[in-house]
């Protein structure tokens, strides 16, 4: 149906429909599994302009939690391996995701360029600057991820995801009852940002994201749970 809407009303309308339906499905699924999502800072989500969402990444559940709470169409810079999962590939393509092969530098650069084009065209995009999922403590945010915002001039919406790994990743992908907390922080403007501020942007955003995590989950030794 989303493809039909794209043909009739344009790409943005198709993406909006796909995200709306995805949010309905995700919300119903999470309710059935007893997963509770708490949202703080919803007022920080821009209503009338597009943005780049920057978040820490604890679990595969993160994508679905974002879609279910954001109430805005959004695509993701996602790892290429997800294209091998037919259902995920179809759904993620329908909401405007861009797939990135981390093992192929040229393709990774092209994926970032494609993401920048989408943001310049008015789409919202999300990227996880750690580059992989972790079991809690954050990895260093990769500075290159922030080009999605600085090259497009879109504001950054920092997001902290807390607790999703205990619901999914720690249970061998069996969803258990629990609570995930999403904290949306105030936006950071990037248009016209001086070069010296761009150079420290990754550290600045990581500090903001980490401020809503327990101290032991901000930095430190962690287990990479993404092969």
Description of each model-found segment:
Residues 39, 53, 76, 182-184:
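Generic preference for hydrophobic
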Residues 109-227:
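Non-catalytic C-terminal accessory region of glycerolipid acyltransferases
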Residues 2-9, 15-20, 24, 31-33, ...:
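Catalytic core of membrane glycerolipid acyltransferases/transacylases, capturing the structured
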